[in-house]
């Protein structure tokens, strides 16, 4: 699977939402993740909103501090259906108030839930909200396959089971879903990521990396044919992982040549510390308001 991808000339990533606001910071934190990715490629300039965290209000507040007008957003990517990545969508769409593509997996509207310590829905998207978003101008682009968004940028599509490396085949989260009226384990097959091609190499942006961040990086390489990986940004969902899983993840990313790690959200303090020890000055902790330039 190879795409004629192209590459971007300039990229800047604004962290609009994250669980940590940073020390002595004016920015608001919240549970979840949201990035504004500003790119320029072959004279084309776009602003891509990647995920919408749990609530719109803190995102809009942080956008105002960063002098970003919501109406300047050109497209939206929803990494997966969990509430801490989709909850702010309606409120943000009200501010965007124009026709705009929303890229996601076809299963993003599935019923997904936890049963411990009690029943709780994991996702907030449903048919009614889907239609409400459409009334505000949202145009759903639901695909299992990768999609090239512009020169140098593409979605990863679904990470199939056979594409996952062995140690990432075990789910990192205990969720269930309804499938033909039956309760089955949810492996979060609806998670997609984003890859960006730069002079320095690939940059991979993830929401929670439920399919496994290493498998997502390998999928990016497979799609693009580019073996050089510069940075991996987002949540890795290693918060409940044992040391063996974390060490395996770090070793695999190092073997793939990943230079920089920018992580937070669901990665977990233990894993973050282990990444920091290995990547040293090339490790960065995400926080609301953080701007990453390449």
Curated annotation (Swiss-Prot):
Pathway involvement of the protein, from the record: Cofactor biosynthesis; 5,6,7,8-tetrahydromethanopterin biosynthesis
Cofactor(s) it depends on: Mg(2+)
GO function terms (MF aspect): 7,8-dihydropterin-6-yl-methyl-4-(beta-D-ribofuranosyl)aminobenzene 5'-phosphate synthase; metal ion binding; transferase activity; transferase activity, transferring alkyl or aryl (other than methyl) groups
Top EC class of this enzyme: transferase
Catalytic activity: 4-(beta-D-ribofuranosyl)aminobenzene 5'-phosphate + (7,8-dihydropterin-6-yl)methyl diphosphate = N-[(7,8-dihydropterin-6-yl)methyl]-4-(beta-D-ribofuranosyl)aniline 5'-phosphate + diphosphate
Residues engaged in binding substrate: 116, 186, 228, 265
UniProt-listed Enzyme Commission number(s): 2.5.1.105
Gene Ontology annotations of biological process type: 5,6,7,8-tetrahydromethanopterin biosynthetic process; pteridine-containing compound metabolic process
InterPro entries, A to Z: DHPS-like_MBL-fold, Metallo-B-lactamas, Metallo-beta-lactamase_dom, RibonucZ/Hydroxyglut_hydro
Keywords: Magnesium, Metal-binding, Transferase
Pfam family, one: Lactamase_B
Primary role: Catalyzes the condensation of 6-hydroxymethyl-7,8-dihydropterin pyrophosphate (DHPP) with 4-(beta-D-ribofuranosyl)-aminobenzene-5'-phosphate (beta-RFA-P) to form 7,8-dihydropterin-6-methyl-4-(beta-D-ribofuranosyl)-aminobenzene-5'-phosphate, a precursor in the biosynthesis of 5,6,7,8-tetrahydromethanopterin (H4MPT). To a lesser extent, is able to condense beta-RFA-P with another arylamine, 1-(4-aminophenyl)-1-deoxy-D-ribitol (APDR), to form 7,8-dihydropterin-6-methyl-1-(4-aminophenyl)-1-deoxy-D-ribitol. Dephosphorylated beta-RFA-P is not a substrate.
Record family assignment: Belongs to the metallo-beta-lactamase superfamily.
Annotated protein name in UniProt: 7,8-dihydropterin-6-methyl-4-(beta-D-ribofuranosyl)-aminobenzene-5'-phosphate synthase
The organism of origin for this protein: Methanocaldococcus jannaschii (strain ATCC 43067 / DSM 2661 / JAL-1 / JCM 10045 / NBRC 100440)
Lineage: Archaea, Methanobacteriati, Methanobacteriota, Methanomada group, Methanococci
């Amino acid at each position: 699977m190879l795409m004629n991808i192209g590459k971007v000339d300039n990229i800047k990533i604004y962290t609009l939402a994250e669980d940590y606001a940073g020390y002595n910071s004016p920015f608001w934190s919240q549970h979840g993740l949201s990035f504004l990715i500003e790119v320029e490629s072959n004279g084309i300039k776009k602003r891509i909103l990647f995920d919408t965290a749990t609530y719109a209000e803190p995102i809009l507040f942080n956008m105002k501090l960063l002098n970003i007008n919501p109406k300047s957003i050109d497209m939206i990517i929803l990494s997966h259906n969990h509430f801490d990545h989709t909850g702010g969508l309606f409120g943000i769409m009200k501010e965007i108030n124009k026709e705009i593509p929303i890229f996601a997996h076809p299963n993003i509207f599935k019923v997904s839930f936890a049963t411990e310590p009690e029943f709780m829905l994991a996702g907030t998207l449903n048919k009614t909200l889907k239609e409400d978003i459409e009334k505000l101008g949202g145009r759903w682009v639901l695909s299992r396959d990768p999609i090239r968004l512009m020169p140098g940028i593409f979605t990863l599509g679904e990470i199939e089971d056979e594409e996952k490396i062995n140690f990432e085949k075990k789910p990192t989260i205990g969720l269930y879903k309804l499938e033909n009226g039956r309760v089955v384990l949810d492996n979060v097959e609806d998670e997609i990521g984003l890859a960006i091609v730069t002079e320095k190499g690939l940059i991979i942006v993830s929401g929670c990396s439920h399919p496994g961040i290493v498998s997502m990086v390998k999928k990016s390489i497979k799609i693009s044919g580019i073996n050089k990986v510069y940075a991996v940004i987002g949540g890795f969902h290693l918060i409940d992982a044992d040391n063996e899983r974390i060490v395996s993840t770090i070793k695999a990313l190092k073997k793939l040549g990943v230079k920089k790690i920018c992580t937070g959200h669901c990665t977990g303090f233990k894993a973050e510390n282990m990444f920091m020890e290995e990547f040293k000055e090339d490790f960065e902790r995400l926080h609301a308001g953080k701007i990453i330039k390449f």
